[in-house]
A protein has these predicted regions:
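Short coil/turn linker and secondary-structure boundary residues
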Residues: 8, 22, 63-66
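Short, contiguous alpha-helical
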Residues: 2, 10-56, 96-130
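Acidic/histidine-rich alpha-helical segments that form the ligand environment
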Residues: 58-95, 105-110, 114
Length: 130
């Protein structure tokens, strides 16, 4: 995800291949919400409030609601928090009420989710001509 988002300009982030399709900003922000959810499940806590009110998919037609640098920063921050938690769990410094298999499935699931959406982002960049 980090590599896919590294070279994205704001005009590319909010471009849509067609009116009914998600833009790159929405795809990235959706993944951020999902990663936050997984972090909460792994830790057994309620994560801090999300950047925007709502759930899962957020309409981001342009930078009016949230600018691309803020979205990109939110993605980076959530990925960092999730990676740190997974490392803490693996080292035994943080406990989870979930079984090892449940933790594995959540981490594998969100990793596959990131790869899937990173591929979508790469495709959107290619379609845009970026």
């Amino acid at each position: 995800m980090k590599a896919a988002l590294g070279d994205v300009a704001p005009e590319v982030a909010f471009w849509r291949p067609s009116p009914e399709r998600h833009n790159l900003a929405e795809v990235a922000f959706h993944h951020t919400f999902c990663a936050r959810s997984v972090r909460g499940q792994l830790s057994g806590t309620t994560p801090e409030p999300f950047v925007l009110e709502g759930q899962d998919w957020f309409a981001l037609p342009g930078p009016e609601r949230l600018a691309w640098p803020q979205i990109h920063a939110a993605v980076e921050e959530e990925q960092t928090k999730l990676a740190a938690l997974v490392a803490e769990l693996a080292a035994g410094r943080t406990l989870s009420r979930l079984s090892e298999a449940e933790r594995f499935n959540l981490v594998l699931g969100i990793t596959c989710h990131a790869v899937y959406h990173a591929g979508q982002i790469q495709l959107l960049k290619r379609l845009h001509g970026a």
